[in-house]
Amino acid sequence: YQYIEPKNQAVVSIQQIDASEFPTVKLYMSIKDKTTGNVIENLDDAFFYINKQDANAKYVKQVVKSANQLNEKEALKVDMVADVSGSMDGSPLNEAKQVMSDFIGSVQFDAGDLVELTSFSTGVCLEQEFSDDAATLTNDINNLVTGDMTSLYDALYTAVERVAAQNGARCVIAFTDGNDNYSNCTKEDVVNVANRYHVPVFIIVIGSIDYADVNDIATQTGGMYYNVSDVTSMD
């Protein structure tokens, strides 16, 4: 396929490619105004075309069947990763639980969204497989308890691999208050596997930590990082 730089004031990037229903291929794209950084809305299939290279190395224009804004038309698969290391004990974990529960309340389960809950401390634990049951997920969140060390990179790596096996749009959202101190994986391992599967990683940081590593992971995988104090809505 051939990528052509847009002629207007738009910043276009391909986030994910889903070929699970080949020959139908879905592209998930970020399209933002170059000046304001805001998402450009009200775009339909007439705004897009794709050139595919044929057996003779010539590019042939392909039909774009439809173009829809993700949060309106397409199911989303999310692996939600919760830090339950010792430093999260007390108010940090309670704050994270509140934001995670708020997020569950905003998920469009009736549209096909699925959420998986993964926790980590000294090790990585699958708390709940991909589910559309908001009550069960909220209960699992409320039952989280703290452990000891911080295996952040191992948890992110595991979450990326698991959500990558799902079809459609996918991402990882992690909540953490500290730097990794116990993983076998490295930051680079997380970035590489996320980019291999085109899975963006979003990180919500709790408290004052060294933002450099989490910023690298988020920005290098097409995600973003936020401080929990700035997060009022996850929808």
Question: Over which residues does each language-model region extend?
Answer:
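Acidic, polar low-complexity linker/tail segments
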Residues: 14, 19-79, 84-93
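C-terminal "exit" segments of structured domains
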Residues: 1-10, 16-25, 219, 226-235
